């Protein structure tokens, strides 16, 4: 199952994302967001993730995963999706930081972490992601 948010494809199931990342030799960018209450999360999506340049970079390099934690009843996620997101939070976001963005290897090892909105232009964020992948010896 995928969620369309602007141009890039965002997965909501980490298992599926890992399978794709392993098959296509990509890294995973995992974003924890509060889409209907977290201002910095909304700005991060608008200023970086929905940027056409970042989208093109992500489409060729990354598998994007979004773990969303909306608060409004009308935006509530299905129970099974809430459980998947809770499991991801237990594993990668135990402090409950929003937004939190992690660059992972295909097998789930954390390479880089951005706590909050990175506060940079989309191209600079893409360069940070690429530098972390290159430093790890990735593609």
Label each region the model flagged:
Residues 10-28, 58:
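A short beta-strand-turn-helix
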Residues 38-42, 101:
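The canonical Cys-X-X-Cys-His
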Residues 41-57:
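Typically the conserved alpha-helix immediately C-terminal to a functionally engaged Cys/Sec
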Residues 24-28, 60-66, 97-99, 106-109:
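Loop/turn elements at helix/coil->beta-strand transitions in domains of secreted/extracellular proteins
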Residues 35-38, 47-48, 69-73, 96, ...:
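Solvent-exposed loop/turn segments at secondary-structure junctions
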Residues 91, 95-137:
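Non-catalytic, surface beta->alpha helical segment in thiol-disulfide oxidoreductase systems
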Residues 8-11, 54-83:
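Thiol-based oxidoreductase modules, predominantly thioredoxin-like and allied folds used
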Residues 24-38:
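Short active-site neighborhood of thiol/selenol oxidoreductases, capturing the structured segment around
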